């Protein structure tokens, strides 16, 4: 094992020197090396095991959730359509990062082309769509609880189509300037990214140019986009909870709180780790070791995708019943 690792290091250094030599003054670099989790190299194999388990669980859970929603006509409602979008985004996020990270942790395959790095970064930061979908789900619950008689007339198929289009456009519009800014930077010979995957500032720090605009754009995009979504979601749930506690029927109140509870769990699972990671990175400084930042970021791309299907499967009765029906139909069909 030690000889294999030594060989990988020699090959990596040779490739790095070759790439650097070709790019002394180029605006682009041929490729990048991802370090994995620096400071924990001896634990890479052991760390890869829980990451692999969580990734497989996330794929299976979200895959089942999407199949249940698509196969059961009773679940072809706005809330479940948005939930299937969230599950699809979770699969995209974890699949964009984990296979490459596991190849790095297991085999030391750390090289990734520059275009591949930009592509990975694009899909990772495409998670802005998570925020837009969570906002759409909050709006759905707001209409269902605060204006139940108008629910069908407000959330028509046409309106849902517009919401889906807006969520996708929202993410593309935010991400394209980041790609443009990175493409037009001048890069140095150093092409090592201390991370398990490519992200905006990790790539920007490889540049010899001034990256102030990248820093400010990233901060502005996060604050104006995600911050606005958080504010609107909070306002929606304040109105929702006010309406729920005004309900006279105890059963109706319990059902509404159960549905909203699932949504709130998913919202907290998405925003709390993200905000903690951002604030720890920006204000933790040297007091928080680098490997802690990278470990948290790596966990963030697998833990929410792994837990979201569990939260909805356990707490949402129609999905649980739909899953039972789907597996029952599959069992009958196999006989």
Curated annotation (Swiss-Prot):
It is a multi-pass membrane protein. PANTHER family: OLFACTORY RECEPTOR 52B6, OLFACTORY RECEPTOR 56B1-RELATED. The keyword Disulfide bond applies. Its main location: membrane. CDD domains: 7tmA_OR52B-like (cd15221). Gene3D superfamilies: Rhodopsin 7-helix transmembrane proteins (1.20.1070.10). Signal peptide: none annotated. Disulfide bonds join 117-208. It comes from the Eukaryota. The chain crosses the membrane at residues 46-66, 75-95, 120-139, 159-179, 216-236, 257-277, 294-314. It is found in: Cell membrane. This is Olfactory receptor 52B6. Odorant receptor. Keywords: Cell membrane, Disulfide bond, G-protein coupled receptor, Glycoprotein, Membrane, Olfaction, Receptor, Sensory transduction, Transducer, Transmembrane, Transmembrane helix. Glycans are attached at residue 23. The keyword Nucleotide-binding does not apply. Pfam families: 7tm_4. Residues 67-74, 140-158, 237-256, 315-335 are cytoplasmic. Belongs to the G-protein coupled receptor 1 family. GO terms for molecular function: G protein-coupled receptor activity; olfactory receptor activity. It comes from Homo sapiens. GO terms for cellular component: plasma membrane. Residues 1-45, 96-119, 180-215, 278-293 are extracellular. InterPro entries: GPCR_Rhodpsn (IPR000276), GPCR_Rhodpsn_7TM (IPR017452), Olfact_rcpt (IPR000725), OR51/52/56-like (IPR050402).
């Amino acid at each position: 094992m030690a000889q294999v690792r030594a060989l990988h290091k020699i090959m990596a250094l040779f490739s790095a020197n070759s790439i650097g030599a070709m790019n002394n003054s180029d605006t682009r670099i041929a490729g990048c090396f991802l370090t994995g989790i620096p400071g924990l190299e001896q634990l890479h194999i052991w760390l890869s095991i829980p990451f692999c388990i969580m990734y497989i669980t996330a794929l299976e859970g979200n895959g089942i959730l999407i199949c249940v929603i698509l196969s059961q006509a009773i679940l072809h409602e706005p809330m479940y359509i948005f939930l299937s979008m969230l599950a699809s985004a979770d699969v995209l996020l974890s699949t964009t990062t984990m296979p490459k990270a596991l190849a790095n942790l297991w085999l030391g395959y750390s090289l990734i082309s520059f275009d591949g790095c930009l592509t990975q970064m694009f899909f990772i930061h495409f998670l802005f769509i998570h925020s837009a979908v969570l906002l759409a789900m909050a709006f759905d619950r707001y209409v269902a609880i605060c204006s139940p008689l108008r629910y069908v007339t407000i959330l028509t198929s046409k309106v849902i189509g517009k919401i889906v289009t807006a969520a996708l456009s929202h993410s593309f519009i935010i991400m394209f300037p980041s790609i443009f800014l990175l493409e037009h930077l001048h890069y140095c010979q150093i092409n090592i990214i201390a991370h398990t995957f490519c992200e905006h500032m990790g790539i920007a720090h490889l540049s010899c140019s001034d990256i102030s605009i990248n820093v400010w754009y990233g901060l502005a995009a996060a604050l104006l986009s995600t911050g606005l979504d958080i504010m609107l979601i909070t306002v929606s749930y304040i109105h929702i909870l006010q309406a729920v506690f005004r309900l006279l029927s105890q059963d109706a109140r319990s059902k509404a709180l159960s549905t909203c509870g699932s949504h709130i769990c998913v919202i907290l699972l998405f925003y709390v780790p993200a905000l903690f990671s951002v604030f720890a990175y920006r204000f933790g400084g040297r007091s928080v070791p680098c490997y802690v930042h990278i470990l948290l970021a790596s966990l963030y791309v697998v833990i929410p995708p792994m837990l979201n299907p569990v939260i909805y499967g356990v707490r949402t009765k129609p999905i649980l019943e739909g899953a039972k029906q789907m597996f029952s139909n599959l069992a009958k069909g196999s006989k």
